[in-house]
């Protein structure tokens, strides 16, 4: 999940150097088997792979950038399409944990997760459910990171604040039936 058009990213607006797709080994700190890895540019809502191609699909903090809950659900359906029966899909994204009236397009509310993300594909069954237990209130009153300083990882939950929106991450595992 590398993006090339956000103003918040490094490398003159790109999250990664422009030649990383052509020469990934140049940026990898360890050797890897080049014949077993392929780097591609693709649209997460229209994956360029055959049905049932993969045993495992993983989306790490990507679907929140696709244009809302409906587009995120479409990306999960695409992951389901390319995952083999019995395969696993892992999705990590941002969860807006307060009921703030502030809108933040790159995080999901509980309702969006329940209405769009979890039920995106009827062939994908949530593994071990979803816990909605939130961190203690003092974590919300004193968030770890206001996007101006480093993340503090000694606390159990990492709660972030962007303006008045409090959010954290969630991770879901699905098994394809």
Model segments located where?
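Short, solvent-exposed loop/turn segments at secondary-structure junctions
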Residues: 2-4, 45, 63-64, 95-98, ...
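A short acidic, Gly/Pro-enriched loop at the edge of an enzyme's catalytic core
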Residues: 42-57
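A short glycine-rich, Lys/Arg-flanked "PGG" loop and its adjoining helix->strand segment in the class I
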Residues: 72-85
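Conserved beta-strand signature within the Rossmann-like core of class I S-adenosyl-L-methionine
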Residues: 86-94
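Conserved Class I S-adenosyl-L-methionine
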Residues: 100-134
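A C-terminal cap/extension of S-adenosyl-L-methionine-dependent methyltransferases
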Residues: 130-177
């Amino acid at each position: 999940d590398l993006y090339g058009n956000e103003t918040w990213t490094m490398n003159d607006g790109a999250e990664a150097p422009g030649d990383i797709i052509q020469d990934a080994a140049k940026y990898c700190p360890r050797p890897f088997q080049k014949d077993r890895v392929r780097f591609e540019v693709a649209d997460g809502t229209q994956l360029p792979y055959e049905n049932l191609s993969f045993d495992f699909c993983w989306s790490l903090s990507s679907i929140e950038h696709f244009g809302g809950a409906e587009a995120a659900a479409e990306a999960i359906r695409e992951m389901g399409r390319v995952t083999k029966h019995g395969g696993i899909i892992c999705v990590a994204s941002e969860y807006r944990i307060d009921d703030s009236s502030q809108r933040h397009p790159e995080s999901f509310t509980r309702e969006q997760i329940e209405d769009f993300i979890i039920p995106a594909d009827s062939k994908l069954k949530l593994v071990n459910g979803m816990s909605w237990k939130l961190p203690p209130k003092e974590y919300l009153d004193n968030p770890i990171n206001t996007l101006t300083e480093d993340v503090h990882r000694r606390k159990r939950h990492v709660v972030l604040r962007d303006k008045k929106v409090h959010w954290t991450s969630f991770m879901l595992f699905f098994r394809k039936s």
